[in-house]
Amino acid sequence: MLMGSIARRYARALFSLAVEQGRVEPWNDALQVLKNAVEGSPDLRDVLSNPVYSKEQRRAIVEKLASALKLEREPANLLFLLGDRNRLAYLAAVVDTFRSLADQHLGRLRARVTSAVPLDASAAQAIADRLSQATKATVLLDRAVDPALLGGVVAQVGSLVYDGSLRTQLEDLRKTLKQ
């Protein structure tokens, strides 16, 4: 609970600055890249959160990372700030909250679509289009693969779940046959 409220504070502050500067989408993209870079490198995460390294050393590393990733100053400053305050563990929550605020601001919804096999681009677009029609909003897909579904897809948009998986259909058939 505490992590969520702290992450929201950082995300809202950065988001309001992004809105003022008209940089919501670019910063959202930059924050996703930053999050992936830090999560993808345990060594980097350790260095940035290890008090053995001075703030100056950590800041120099963040500057090199920001330069390598071609980040704007403000998204990079988030990493400086979290590192300086020993709150690097909040980075993922801050970025996810910022993304939610950006999606809401831009009138988008995110749908988690799980399929038994990877979806090709045309199938993913068809699902996004159908979900957009159903929700009357622009829908962006976060795709996942779960072979246990056997076939079909499960789409979750907010609290709504559309389950068209073969696994569920077989379970429903089994229940019907037992009656």
Curated annotation (Swiss-Prot):
Family membership noted in the UniProt record: Belongs to the ATPase delta chain family.
Membrane topology, as annotated: Peripheral membrane protein
InterPro entries noted in UniProt: ATP_synth_OSCP/delta_N_sf, ATPase_OSCP/dsu
A Pfam family this chain is assigned to: OSCP
SUPFAM superfamilies in the cross-refs: N-terminal domain of the delta subunit of the F1F0-ATP synthase (SSF47928)
Disulfide bonds: none
Subunit annotation: F-type ATPases have 2 components, F(1) - the catalytic core - and F(0) - the membrane proton channel. F(1) has five subunits: alpha(3), beta(3), gamma(1), delta(1), epsilon(1). F(0) has three main subunits: a(1), b(2) and c(10-14). The alpha and beta chains form an alternating ring which encloses part of the gamma chain. F(1) is attached to F(0) by a central stalk formed by the gamma and epsilon chains, while a peripheral stalk is formed by the delta and b chains.
Main localization of the protein described in the UniProt heading: membrane
UniProt GO molecular function: proton-transporting ATP synthase activity, rotational mechanism
Record keywords, A-Z: ATP synthesis, Cell inner membrane, Cell membrane, CF(1), Hydrogen ion transport, Ion transport, Membrane, Transport
Protein name in the entry: ATP synthase subunit delta
UniProt keyword Transport, yes or no: yes
Gene behind the chain: atpH
Compartments, record wording: Cell inner membrane
Tree of life domain: Bacteria
GO cellular component, one term: proton-transporting ATP synthase complex
Known role: F(1)F(0) ATP synthase produces ATP from ADP in the presence of a proton or sodium gradient. F-type ATPases consist of two structural domains, F(1) containing the extramembraneous catalytic core and F(0) containing the membrane proton channel, linked together by a central stalk and a peripheral stalk. During catalysis, ATP synthesis in the catalytic domain of F(1) is coupled via a rotary mechanism of the central stalk subunits to proton translocation. This protein is part of the stalk that links CF(0) to CF(1). It either transmits conformational changes from CF(0) to CF(1) or is implicated in proton conduction.
